[in-house]
């Protein structure tokens, strides 16, 4: 029996509709949420990603700005662009599209963003607040997964969640979010990675399995507990197709599964917009 589809595209559309109503209320009060993107260099994929985020923002009534710097831009140039956006009261959310060209320090740039405008949730202050249980913004993919599981009524509380991947964007923040004493969370979390010995021994115990290691088809059917909910964060080009970290046969074992594309990706963008609206809501 094929797994139930965890339809991130449909859930994200519902979230955007909800946000549009709040954006309208904020705009009527003279505070239209606005997202600014800093784009450095001429990487084609980065331009595509920023364009898709801006279009999604505009569909929800969120204002969007784009600051483009050439590939020759220095660290000082990028930091100056961020400082200008920090000072602009009409901008509520700032994202710096990664990767930056070689020679630039993305950590210093991310740390320069005003924490109250850090809608990617990567500033040290926001990371610390997440760990403390008082989050302002959480990384968009991580919180998007939590929201998708909640809205698709996947039982998380009391479950064993296994995350494969320890990155700052997904694995580590997601472990904090899923283990939090909060509705839609309160799971026991095991955080694994590509260096974990006997990985399948952990994944086969998972009620909720998140594949976020960045390796195509790494999670095979034999590694999945029958009936488990599987979230595939992978996004890899294979010829003319996009594939994930989960092998195709997993759909015959899992109870629920996110598609690639159309699963986690739309949720990431939706939560970026949600964070932007939340930033505009701040006094």
Model-identified regions with their sequence ranges:
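Positively charged, low-complexity intrinsically disordered leader regions
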Residues: 1-31
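N-terminal glycine-rich anion-binding loops that anchor highly charged ligand groups
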Residues: 25-35, 41-59
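Glycine-rich phosphate/diphosphate-binding loop of Rossmann-like nucleotide-binding domains
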Residues: 40, 45-54, 135-229, 238-251
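Short beta-strand elements in bilobed, periplasmic/extracellular small-molecule ligand-binding domains
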Residues: 57-71, 185-191
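Short, well-structured alpha-helical segments in soluble
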Residues: 77-89
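Anion-binding alpha/beta catalytic cores of soluble intermediary-metabolism enzymes, centered on
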Residues: 93-161, 202
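Short glycine-rich anion-binding loops that position phosphate/pyrophosphate groups of nucleotides
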Residues: 97-103, 169, 215-217, 235-236, ...
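Rossmann-fold NAD(P)-binding glycine/threonine-rich loop
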Residues: 105-127, 231-283
